[in-house]
Amino acid sequence: MKKLLIANRGEIALRVVRTAQEMGIETVAVYAEQDRNAPYTQMADEAYLLPGDTNLQTYLNEDLIVDVARRAGADALHPGYGFLSEFPTFARKVIDAGITWVGPSPHVLEELGDKITACKVAERAKVPVVPGIAEPVSDMRVLLDFANHNGYPVMMKKADGGGGRGITPINNDDELRAFYMNHDALQGGDLGDYFIEKFVDKARHVETQSGRDSHGNFTVYSTRDCSVQRRNQKLVEEAPAPFLSDDVIAQLEGFSHRLFATAGYVGLGTCEFLVSKGKVYFMEVNPRLQVEHTVSEQVCGLDLVREQLDIADGG
């Protein structure tokens, strides 16, 4: 890896530029007009303008960014987080252009791209999931049967939700019927985007910062507790996650390993779990670097961007 394009902006672009330059890798930044004088464009070895007025025309423009990477002579591309970092179409275009994609493969991004398909990966890996129906249900009777068999409360969750979006708690039959009527696909609603899960009471939200290389070597860099939230948005991240028994830690690490191995995951990512009464339940995998990766760096003593670049380069 000799020349790296960072397909992002702001803090994460600056973060990747810094590490790449420490590794002796030339860096290429891309920017929309409003970011022309941003610190990351000044620090990078080269910077290219993305013409356009919106994110869709600039930072979300897959073909334009791949074309810039070609013109700049970049042999690798780091997507950062957000924007195109989880788009399998973009990853495939980068790879098809002969450029190293710093992240998991397009196939892995597809499998982990929404909560329903990710739960199916977990089931193949024999990792416990929260009791639920891991597919959209259009029959009201099926939803009511599930809720009454497992007990309220339950949750209706959007398959492509993230960051606390698309979660609706349901406490009784009337609320479930109201949700169904408001989202019924036959009336132009989005019921087909939702699945049902049992609500896990008094659960902690614990995640593992994990990595796996192309040789199958796996590690958990640290656990993180992100249970302190407001409106399902994380407020505080603590690493390592406190007050976990040895058995729970072993479950978290073992389940993360099985998830990565089953998916054929190569790169860094975050496995998210619910922990309740000594039991661990899979939630999702974030197949990219997360904003909070620096919390894990503080306790593991490693540069996780360097780890990403080493793994992508075959290390």
Outline where the language-model segments fall.
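N-terminal beta-alpha lobe that positions the nucleotide/phosphoryl donor
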Residues: 1-271, 275-296
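Catalytic cores of soluble metabolic enzymes centered on carboxylation/carboxyl-transfer
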Residues: 296, 302-315
